[in-house]
């Protein structure tokens, strides 16, 4: 099975769901056999890391200036109904590829400051508030599980998700039912 990376324009049209994953193709087909209704983002695909230049805030608001498959990932997340992330748990965080995708979504926010949940954050660029489901796989210690839960909650607040659910499993294939029901 070939993974297709769908790019969404900035037309304001809302995607139903975005599925961000770090799986190899045969495992992806076992977890998500039917990708219709999803914009699938393969975190293993070659794409540049965020350079921290903030030109997505200033030079091309809402869009990364690096012209690759992650150029509009912030707009995709900001205008969809739900985001599902399936990632190997790495020391209580996302895998490097999934983290790269989330780093490139910095254009979800604006270059100003505001208070949310009693803390200083950047205001959000989009009014839409998608739901977030995160499925971590791999052998995870209690400390890594606790760290991952805190990280995902911080991402929920910072990226403007309306709600979050987090799941853990030894193998990604065990998440197929969770993803199917999201």
Where are these regions (language model features)?
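N-terminal beta1-alpha1-beta2 submodule of the flavodoxin-like/Rossmannoid cofactor-binding fold
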Residues: 1-83, 87-110, 157, 174-182
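Short, glycine-/small-residue-rich phosphate/pyrophosphate-handling segment
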Residues: 112-162
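Structural motif
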Residues: 19-24, 137-140, 168-170
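A structural preference for short, hydrophobic beta-strand core positions in alpha/beta folds
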Residues: 37-40, 163-168
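A short, well-structured beta->alpha microelement
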Residues: 115, 168-174
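Hydrophobic beta-strand segments of well-ordered beta-sheets in folded domains
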Residues: 13-18, 82-84, 126-135, 162-166
């Amino acid at each position: 099975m070939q993974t297709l990376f769908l790019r969404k324009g900035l037309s304001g049209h809302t995607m139903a769901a975005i599925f961000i994953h770090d799986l190899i193709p045969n495992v992806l087909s076992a977890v998500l056999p039917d990708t219709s209704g999803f914009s699938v983002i393969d975190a293993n695909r070659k794409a540049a890391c965020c350079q921290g230049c903030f030109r997505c805030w200033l030079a091309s608001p809402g869009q990364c200036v690096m012209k690759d498959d992650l150029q509009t990932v912030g707009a995709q997340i900001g205008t969809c109904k739900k985001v599902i992330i399936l990632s190997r748990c790495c020391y209580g965080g996302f895998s490097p590829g999934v983290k790269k995708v989330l780093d490139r979504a910095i254009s979800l926010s604006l270059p100003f400051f505001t208070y949310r949940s009693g803390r200083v954050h950047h205001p959000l660029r989009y009014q839409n508030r998608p739901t977030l489901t995160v499925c971590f796989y791999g052998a995870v210690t209690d400390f890594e599980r606790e760290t991952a839960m805190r990280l995902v909650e911080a991402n929920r607040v910072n990226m403007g998700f309306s709600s979050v659910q987090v799941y853990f499993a030894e193998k990604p294939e065990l998440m197929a039912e969770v993803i199917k029901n999201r």
